[in-house]
């Protein structure tokens, strides 16, 4: 009697569905218990599969943690690229506004997991997400910034990595500050003004100046003052978090 053939496509879909269930359960357990406190048996229970099945996908808990981290950052990259693709205008500052709003919201909604991933990066190189995945994510900003320079909207002498650090660094600390107010008695800080201020900062410092491609001393003074204020806010927030 002939054996009924298994549709390879159906089998692949089942395997992918099972892997997604493992990764979703693993992320929840890692956030709740941290990497060291997480147990593979608990992940298996939440994914409704046997513990041995997890090891057929991932050789160790560390490998599973890496897969969760990579899935997360790769997903963010795809979403950020989709935000850029859906932003109809080509104007740099409008697109920067859209990317800033997306990134700030992601930081707040996923605060627990992002904090875990940064802690692992500092303390556990075995399960730290690779720089390649982070580079792919921030490359969305890099392409936007370089295109702004090509279009003549931004200064030609602007340093990309400095602009990138200001953009993501400011949003990171603002996101933490906003997230800290979610369960507090006082009103939660609004997201939109934060992004508006960052866009205004980029406009005042990085905006192209007709005929020079540079900027005057007053613009540098304004940027210096704004960065000093940002530094003070970061110091205050760091003290609150410590």
Please place each PLM-identified region on the residue numbering.
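Hydrophobic alpha-helical connector segments
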Residues: 67, 81-109, 167
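Short coil/turn segments at alpha/beta junctions that flank glycine-rich nucleotide-binding fingerprints
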Residues: 32-36, 110, 151
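C-terminal peripheral helix-coil segments that are non-catalytic and often amphipathic
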Residues: 1-4, 139, 143-151, 176, ...
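Generic hydrophobic, amphipathic alpha-helix propensity
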Residues: 18-26, 43, 68-72, 76, ...
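Amphipathic alpha-helical packing segments from all-alpha helical-bundle domains
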Residues: 77, 105-106, 125-153, 161-176, ...
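Short, structured helix-loop boundary elements
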Residues: 12, 19-20, 40, 62, ...
């Amino acid at each position: 009697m002939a054996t009924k053939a298994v549709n390879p496509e159906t089998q692949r879909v089942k395997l992918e569905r099972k892997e997604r269930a493992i990764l979703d359960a693993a992320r929840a357990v890692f956030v709740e218990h941290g990497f060291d406190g997480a147990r593979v048996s608990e992940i298996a229970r939440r994914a409704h599969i046997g513990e041995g099945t997890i090891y057929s996908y991932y050789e160790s808990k560390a490998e599973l943690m890496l897969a969760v981290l990579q899935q997360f950052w790769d997903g963010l990259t795809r979403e950020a690229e989709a935000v850029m693709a859906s932003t109809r205008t080509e104007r740099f500052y409008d697109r920067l506004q859209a990317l800033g709003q997306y990134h700030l919201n992601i930081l707040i909604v996923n605060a627990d997991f992002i904090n875990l991933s940064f802690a692992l990066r500092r303390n556990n190189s075995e399960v730290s997400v690779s720089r390649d995945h982070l580079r792919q994510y921030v490359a969305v900003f890099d392409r936007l910034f370089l295109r702004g320079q090509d279009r003549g909207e931004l200064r030609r002498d602007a340093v990309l990595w400095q602009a990138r650090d200001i953009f993501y660094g400011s949003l990171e600390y603002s996101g933490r500050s906003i997230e800290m107010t979610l369960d507090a008695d006082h009103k939660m800080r609004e997201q939109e003004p934060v992004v508006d201020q960052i866009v205004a900062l980029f406009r005042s410092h990085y905006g192209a100046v007709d005929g020079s491609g540079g900027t005057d001393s007053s613009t540098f003074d304004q940027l210096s003052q704004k960065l000093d204020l940002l530094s003070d806010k970061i110091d205050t927030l760091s003290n609150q978090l410590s």
